[in-house]
């Protein structure tokens, strides 16, 4: 602030001379001189007594958090290394035997499986998901496909209904279900689907979002885990992305999600038999779901809500890293921002509602409760977002104006470098994009922080649900053109952050000596590019 006032104060002599000429007096000049000196003194005292000590305290907190994040990242990757070195794949840890048809019973030894496909105005992808579900290699008399259509567009409703009729004519047991309203969004649709009488005969439930395409042998590989291990409630597959090469933004998403599955899901499954259900590409044991109370629509992360409640009952989860399901990444920046808002707001709101329930739980050991509260929720779903945004996008840039505050190199270079490398190894083919990925993740941390705050304090958008826009098979579908009108493309939050960091970079370039401007110029560019809408397709 003083630096901004200094140029103005330096002009006061000129103004005073003019005033002296006009009023022929020296008293006014002396008064204004005194005011300028007093303002300068007050600012220096405020800066030294309040601002600098407060900033130092914030930096210390950030350093502690950076160590916690570092330890968590190293721990998860050590678990992944352990799985690889000692071949601790789920097939080796849990009993698994391939499904075989009984000569006497025929298909009767196959359990009844319900496949749910929730959708909402999914014109581009509904054929892909319905077709993939109907092609699953499972006895047709032991499989029920349920299409839960919440579409509001009559034309799309008709298309989805016709697609279901087409597969029904091929002796596929498929049911097209609609409801009168969209209460509860996806959770409400799933809950409504479970009320139908034919569902009661099913033992297992497989869920696929409208853009997911399971391979034909998906059930053959997943169901045996549930059949031969009665303590297991969930088998989760990883996602494989059909449009990862569409643009740079989808490559960045692929890197983030690959790390999520490789490190977070695999370590949770290996060490604690618990992780967050990804909402799709998973198979549930119906008994476990019913025991936990089924689907609830109190948050926008009904999948995580169900997983936590089932896990607190003592059920185990299995993540199968080499069981992949094709899916689509949002390729438009607006759609991606809405998705990230939901994925950050929902968990924060859920931990607000479930903290005491987890603490008072008597069914699981204290270490598992600690893992769920600290690692699963607090560190990964809340603290990481705040830390990434405030430390790398606010604290570091602002520190150039406060040379008295020393931020050690290990916190700005060594620790983030190790964390970045550990994250990047999940997607070796994109290793050369790691710098772009870090800068983009910092930009998105701003939106995730905002979503987390809304979830924690139940702000106005806490239950906002915007269905992620899909484009279908990007190899055969023309990409939607970016809106050419600048006002509709501009994102003011990103622009403001970019301008602020750019100012900090310029100041550090002119007066600093730590070369922090090298990072600040790159981060400012990332914010500004996002701000003018040149991200995605």
Swiss-Prot record:
Gene3D superfamilies reported for this sequence: Spore Coat Polysaccharide Biosynthesis Protein SpsA, Chain A
Reaction(s) the record says it catalyses: GDP-mannose + (glucomannan)n = GDP + (glucomannan)n+1
Membrane topology field: Multi-pass membrane protein
Catalytic residues in the record: 150, 303
Compartments in which it is found: Golgi apparatus membrane
UniProt keyword annotations, A-Z: Cell wall biogenesis/degradation, Glycosyltransferase, Golgi apparatus, Membrane, Transferase, Transmembrane, Transmembrane helix
UniProt cross-references to InterPro entries, sorted A to Z: Glyco_trans_2-like, Nucleotide-diphossugar_trans
GO MF term (any one): glucomannan 4-beta-mannosyltransferase activity
GO terms under cellular component: Golgi membrane
EC number: 2.4.1.32
Enzyme class: transferase
Annotated residues for binding of substrate: 209, 211
Predominant localisation class: Golgi
Physiological role: Probable mannan synthase which consists of a 4-beta-mannosyltransferase activity on mannan using GDP-mannose. The beta-1,4-mannan product is the backbone for galactomannan synthesis by galactomannan galactosyltransferase. Galactomannan is a noncellulosic polysaccharides of plant cell wall.
Membership in a protein family: Belongs to the glycosyltransferase 2 family. Plant cellulose synthase-like A subfamily.
Protein name: Probable glucomannan 4-beta-mannosyltransferase 15
Lineage, top ranks: Eukaryota, Viridiplantae, Streptophyta, Embryophyta, Tracheophyta
Gene it is expressed from: CSLA15
């Amino acid at each position: 602030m003083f630096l901004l006032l200094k140029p103005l104060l330096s002009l006061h002599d000129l103004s005073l001379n003019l005033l002296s000429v006009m009023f022929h007096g020296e008293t006014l000049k002396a008064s204004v001189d005194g005011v300028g000196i007093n303002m300068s003194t007050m600012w220096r005292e405020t800066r030294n007594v309040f601002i600098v000590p407060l900033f130092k305290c914030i930096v210390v907190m950030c350093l502690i958090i950076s160590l916690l994040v570092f330890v968590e990242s190293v721990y998860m990757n050590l678990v992944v290394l352990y799985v690889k070195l000692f071949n601790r794949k789920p097939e080796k840890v849990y009993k698994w035997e391939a499904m075989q048809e009984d000569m006497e019973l025929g298909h009767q030894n196959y359990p009844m499986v319900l496949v749910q496909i929730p959708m909402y105005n999914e014109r581009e992808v509904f054929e892909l998901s319905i077709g993939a579900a109907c092609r699953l290699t499972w006895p047709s008399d032991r499989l029920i496909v349920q299409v839960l259509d919440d579409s509001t567009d009559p034309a799309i409703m008709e298309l989805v209904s016709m697609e279901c009729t087409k597969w029904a004519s091929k002796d596929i047991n498929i049911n097209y279900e609609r409801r009168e309203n969209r209460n509860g969004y996806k959770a409400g649709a799933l809950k409504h689907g479970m009320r139908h009488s034919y569902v009661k005969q099913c033992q297992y439930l497989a869920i696929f979002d409208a853009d997911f395409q399971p391979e034909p042998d998906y059930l053959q590989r997943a169901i045996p885990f549930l059949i031969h291990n009665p303590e297991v409630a969930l088998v989760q597959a990883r996602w494989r992305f059909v449009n990862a090469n569409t643009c740079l933004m989808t490559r960045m998403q692929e890197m983030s999600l690959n790390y999520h599955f490789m490190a977070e899901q695999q370590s949770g499954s290996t060490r604690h038999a618990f992780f967050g259900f990804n909402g799709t590409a998973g198979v549930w044991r119906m008994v476990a779901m019913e025991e936990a109370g089924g689907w609830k629509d109190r948050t926008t992360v009904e999948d995580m809500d169900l997983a936590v409640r089932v896990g607190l009952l003592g059920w185990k989860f299995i993540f199968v890293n080499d069981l992949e399901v094709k899916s689509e990444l949002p390729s438009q920046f607006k759609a991606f921002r809405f998705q990230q808002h939901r994925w950050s707001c929902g968990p924060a709101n859920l931990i607000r509602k479930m903290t005491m329930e987890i603490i008072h739980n008597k069914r699981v050991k204290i270490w598992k409760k600690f893992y769920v509260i600290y690692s699963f929720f607090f560190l990964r779903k809340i603290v990481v977002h705040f830390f990434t945004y405030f430390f790398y996008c606010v604290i570091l840039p602002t520190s150039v104006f406060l040379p008295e505050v020393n931020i050690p190199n290990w916190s700005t270079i060594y620790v983030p470098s190790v964390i970045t490398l550990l994250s990047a190894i999940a997607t070796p083919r994109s290793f050369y994009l790691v710098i772009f990925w870090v800068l983009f993740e910092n930009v998105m941390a701003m939106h995730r922080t905002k979503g987390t705050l809304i979830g924690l304090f139940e702000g106005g958008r806490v239950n906002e649900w915007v269905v992620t826009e899909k484009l279908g098979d990007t190899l055969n579908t023309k990409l939607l053109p970016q809106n050419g009108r600048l006002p509709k493309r501009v994102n003011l939050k990103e622009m403001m952050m970019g301008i602020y960091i750019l100012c900090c970079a310029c100041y550090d370039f002119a007066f600093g000596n730590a070369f922090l401007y090298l990072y600040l110029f790159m981060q400012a560019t990332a914010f500004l590019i996002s701000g003018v809408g040149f991200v995605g397709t």
